[in-house]
Amino acid sequence: MKAVFLTLLFGLVCTAQETPAEIDPSKIPGEWRIIYAAADNKDKIVEGGPLRNYYRRIECINDCESLSITFYLKDQGTCLLLTEVAKRQEGYVYVLEFYGTNTLEVIHVSENMLVTYVENYDGERITKMTEGLAKGTSFTPEELEKYQQLNSERGVPNENIENLIKTDNCPP
């Protein structure tokens, strides 16, 4: 009887857990702007921080086996345009060498919103961060709520959210 109860309980718990949404790769490529970033080590994403970047474009290479990411970094107020290629590991998890080793996962994508979860290892510490991107220059209240939910699920503090679009004065 105990075994039947435990089996039933296990089945209910498994059923109640949210199934991760499937990523539609056709929605990944395009013109994207970073709206928000959050990190457990906020120093990495504050203005002048090494991981504060301003996305412009993401392209899929070979059916998203690699991602070409075009973005700006600011160096003493000067916008530097860079393009880096991230190589797919599994699912929608990619590895990119930039200010350390970065494991980047596309965790949500819709018509107007894309969210990445990044773990950056700089040789000393792993920083967990999320990046909330939009096709425009803002999130709807529902998109912001979704972004905050994804932060919570990944252990990234919502109080560390930085509004990057406010400081994005780099060329389109």
Swiss-Prot record:
GO terms for cellular component: extracellular space. It comes from the Eukaryota. Found exclusively in skin. Produced in sweat glands and transported to the skin surface. Keywords: Allergen, Disulfide bond, Pyrrolidone carboxylic acid, Secreted, Signal, Transport. The lineage of its organism: Eukaryota, Metazoa, Chordata, Craniata, Vertebrata. This is Allergen Bos d 2. CDD domains: lipocalin_OBP-like. Its main location: secreted. InterPro entries: Calycin, Lipocalin, Lipocln_cytosolic_FA-bd_dom, OBP-like. Residues 1-16 form the signal peptide. GO terms for molecular function: odorant binding; small molecule binding. It is found in: Secreted. The modification Pyrrolidone carboxylic acid is found at residue 17. Probable pheromone carrier. Disulfide bonds join 60-64, 79-170. Belongs to the calycin superfamily. Lipocalin family.
